[in-house]
Design a protein with these regions (language model features):
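Conserved protein-kinase catalytic-loop segment immediately C-terminal to the catalytic Asp
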Residues: 266, 271-273
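Phosphate/dinucleotide-binding and metal-coordinating scaffold of catalytic cores
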Residues: 1-255, 259-261, 273-379
Length: 379
């Protein structure tokens, strides 16, 4: 089968791919040399590179209810090109898509920013239950959304929101939505460029909610798609090449993550914004995805008193670098110190309906204040 990779309605690459295998064999047939600058910034234009890029345009294996979702659509993880044929590789991250050669669809008619989503697929993605859906086009962002937790995109009042549940199955699970909601308040108090989060209950599940921060003008690209090896040192070097604005944003993230004890900052949940009309990186992306922060997995014994909580906190480490406080102290600037001062008397604003227990919330609040004092060398 022959396919065409497009940005908007501009054809960029024509390729053939075998469809009867989990590892399609790719052959590049044609490239648009005049528009080479508009190829995805994370695409290496070789058969293997295109294969890697295409894998990112299908639902990940660790996504909640992935097998139920695909089965109801007559699809299978072992046939990725069949998934792409149905969802056209459309994403809410950017304006690239993949169509079968000869398909006359236009981006205006199928893109996920402007056109309705399938509510049936949203419910399937979130609950694992629903009716079978068999059609030549499945208009849904669920096929290109990453992450393990149950989640789905919903269009409400003309805006697009991500609804995301928490972990399940044990006494210390399910707190991720609270962490998203409260961490966003800390970011706001500091003046950190981060996405606001709300709380809502949908399908009987407590969810964090946030508005989509991409559109047809600006795309999001995770830093892990641009820097594939070398760890945080390589990321910093990449940011330094892009300028002070990016370095400052990286440092701000490290300080913020130290305050909230974010144990799940990884190379997929921070990155850059790309101007879709020029295909150039224009700014750091806002921070998001803070569910694994503010001691969300601490068991009941850790909340007995401050000493028990601090003993638990001592066991927490960042995902991709050495330690929270030491790393943050090393990048502190006068501007970041000023942001931390806003936390010295920080108080959470309670949600009107959904909140952590009062004792737990106040203990988290005191730890936020204390971690700010430690970073400011007041302790």
């Amino acid at each position: 089968m022959n396919y065409i990779l497009k940005q908007f309605d501009e054809p960029l690459v024509k390729f053939s791919a075998t469809t009867d295998t989990s590892e399609p064999e790719i052959q590049i047939l044609w490239t648009n040399e005049e528009k080479a600058a508009f190829l995805p910034l994370d695409l290496t234009l070789t058969p293997d590179g295109l294969s890697r890029w295409l894998r990112r345009r299908t639902i990940p294996k660790n996504r909640a209810y992935v097998h139920s979702l695909l089965a109801k659509c007559g699809l299978n993880l072992n046939r990725p090109l069949s998934i792409i044929s149905i969802c056209k590789g459309l994403s809410l991250n950017d304006c690239y898509w993949v169509i079968e050669d000869g398909d006359t669809a236009s981006f205006d008619k199928v893109n996920l920013y402007d056109n309705p989503f399938s509510n049936v697929l949203a419910e399937l993605a979130f609950t694992g239950y629903g009716s079978s859906v068999r059609t030549s086009l499945l208009s849904s962002p669920e096929f290109t959304t990453n992450g393990m937790l149950r989640k789905c995109w919903r269009r409400i009042g003309g805006k697009v929101y991500l609804y995301k549940g928490g972990t399940e199955g044990a006494a210390n699970t399910g707190n991720e939505p609270y962490s998203e909601f409260y961490a966003a308040q800390i970011a706001s108090a500091m003046g950190v460029h981060a996405i606001p989060y709300g709380l809502s209950r949908w399908k009987g599940v407590l969810c964090s909610t946030c508005e989509l921060f991409t559109d047809k003008a600006y795309a999001y690209l995770p830093i892990g798609h641009l820097v594939s090896k070398g760890g945080m040192g390589a990321v910093r070097a990449y940011y330094e090449k892009m300028g002070d604005k990016f370095v400052n944003a990286l440092n701000e993230m490290l300080v913020f993550d130290a305050v909230i004890c974010n144990v799940d900052r990884h190379y997929g949940n921070f990155g850059v914004m790309v101007d879709n009309r020029t295909n150039t990186i224009v700014s750091p992306a806002p921070l998001f995805d803070h569910g694994n922060s503010l001691f969300n997995f601490a068991g009941a014994d850790a909340w007995a008193n401050e000493t028990a909580l601090e003993e638990y906190i001592e066991t927490l480490y960042p995902s991709v670098y050495d330690d929270f406080l030491g790393t943050a102290k090393a990048v502190l600037t006068p501007e970041l110190r000023e942001k931390l001062r806003h936390l010295l008397n920080f108080k959470f604003k309670k949600h009107s309906r959904y909140n952590l227990p009062e004792k737990r919330l106040r203990m988290v609040e005191r730890q936020v204040q204390k971690r700010a004092r430690i970073l400011l060398l007041y302790l």
